[in-house]
Amino acid sequence: MRLSTSAIALCVGLLVARGAAAVELPQRWVSAGGALSEWVSALGAQARLVGVDTTSQHPESLKALPSIGYQRQLSAEGILSLSPQILIGTEEMGPPPVLSQIRSAGVQVELFSAQPDLPTLQNTLQRLGRLLGSEAQATALFDGYQQQLVQQQAWVSQAQTTAKAPGVLLLLGHAGGKPLIAGKDTAADWLLQQAGGRNLATHSGYKPFSVESLAGLTPDVLVFSDRALTGDAAREALFKQNPILASTPAAKTGRVLELDPTLLVGGLGPRLPQSLVKLSAGFYPAESAKATAAQ
């Protein structure tokens, strides 16, 4: 059977259209959000990144890329000097006039939600998958992520059959000074809940820590994230700058845990499930020890 000229033309047109669509995918990316940069890398597209913001610290190789500064205080000149085709970030990215200037220069600007929940993450990965031409890989990443969380929740449920959920406060600071208490509707709150903790903070967002804010609260566990220091130096700075914390049950029993602050930026990132395992072990040390001994 011979194909008509019109049929052949249609087939050729479809092939050309598909090829053009593939070619038109943005190849030069700038990312202003730690979690988004990590997901782009996890999708095998780190080579497309030509610039990242200061919250993009993982994987380590991202630190070699040009920095565009802090995600909330971007400069159009700095970003445009990298000749990007696309700029991605969360709704925290700004300021708005800078984003408008970047759009006017012909750069595609894509905003993602930083809401810490699975439906939002699924949407984020689907969009990134389409923009990168890696939709199947994005779906597989989300499915694997979700499975890790299911396993984590099963472990927490088992641990809570013999131990109650600890009361927890999460403090985010800079060299120990003026820490913020993580409240509801934050990635930190999501982390604490998923790890099996009970966030004692009842406010929304982040609230400055004070002696008054600690009144009536008796945290079993303190979790701290420091943007400037790590390890023992961060812990010592926290208690030196905020001596009232030494009176908490958490400090007296040594249940003070450190959390990488980059995990709290830009929504749910790929390293969160592993961090949940570590937090849960700190929340339920006896149960964690039993599980380790049984292995």
What do the predicted segments below correspond to?
Residues 76-83, 210-218:
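Short helices/loops that flank or line small-molecule/ion binding pockets
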Residues 27-93, 98:
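A short, structured surface patch at a secondary-structure boundary
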Residues 23-28, 97-176, 198-204, 252-295:
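Extracytoplasmic substrate-binding proteins
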Residues 16-19:
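N-terminal signal peptide c-region/cleavage motif recognized by signal peptidases
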Residues 1-8:
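Bacterial N-terminal signal peptides that target proteins for export
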